[in-house]
From Swiss-Prot:
Alphabetical list of InterPro entries matching this protein: DRICH1-like
Region of interest called Disordered, as start-end residue ranges on this chain: 84-106
UniProt-listed PANTHER family: ASPARTATE-RICH PROTEIN 1 (PTHR15880:SF0)
Protein name: Aspartate-rich protein 1
Signal peptide residues on this chain, from the entry's feature table: none
């Protein structure tokens, strides 16, 4: 605690007789004496707090420390290590050397099903990601490899006899078609002939012919033309 003033300059305060009180020239001397004594008694040692410290005095308990920082060029990525049968999946943080290239595009390629595989609906076909030559999202077709007469057609392949996969769709393959349209051939749509026992409410059969030289014409055939005699 701070020092206590044990002297008084007032003669009416009841100071004990026989003891001489120190004399002060003014009130300012009293305040300076008390302040000097208080400042000496309120010195705080490191780690200790003085309850009698005066207001407005700053105390430092913890010095400022900087946190350690790593080099900014390090970049970390999460990489999973193969797990053993007993241990759980472990993870290790390693620098990532993977860099994406603007020229490389990936495509999904399905691997052929082996002959001894069972045709289960729950099992999906294995897939492998390989580099693709597709550029700009479109397949580049080389027209120089085929002649102008060749036309492409969709051909369904026959189902094998030992195939047990009823849920699988028929495979399809695009092959060159030898069919060539000639300008002299006329296209026509022929309706099936009406039987005699059919109702008379049905419209007459229709025959459509198309030629290069003329427009499309719609011809209605009468019963006499269909069944002569």
């Amino acid at each position: 605690m701070g020092n206590i003033l044990t002297c008084c300059i007032n003669s009416h305060c009841g100071w004990p007789r026989g003891k001489d009180a120190p004399c002060y020239e003014s009130d300012t001397d009293i305040y300076e004496t008390v302040a000097a004594a208080t400042s000496e008694s309120t010195t705080v040692e490191p780690g200790k707090l003085d309850v009698g410290a005066t207001e407005g005095q700053d105390l430092q308990h913890i010095s400022n420390q900087k946190m350690p920082t790593g080099p900014p060029e390090d970049r970390l990525s999460l990489k999973f290590l193969p797990s053993s049968e007993e241990d759980n999946d472990d993870a290790k943080i390693l620098p990532s050397p993977v860099q994406g290239s603007s020229e490389d595009n990936l495509s999904l390629v399905c691997l052929p099903r082996s002959e001894d595989d069972d045709c289960d609906d729950d099992d999906d076909d294995d897939a492998q990601i390989l580099p693709s030559r597709v550029q700009g999202g479109c397949y580049r077709f080389d027209s120089s490899s085929c002649s102008s007469e060749d036309n492409l057609s969709l051909v369904c392949l026959p189902r094998s006899e030992d195939d047990d996969c009823d849920d699988d769709d028929d495979d399809a393959q695009i092959l060159p078609s030898p069919v060539q349209a000639c300008s002299e051939d006329s296209l026509f749509l022929r309706c099936s002939l009406r039987h005699k026992d059919e109702e008379e409410e049905d419209d007459d059969d229709i025959h459509i012919t198309a030629r290069i030289e003329s427009d499309l014409t719609l011809e209605s055939l009468s019963d006499e033309e269909i069944h002569p005699g």
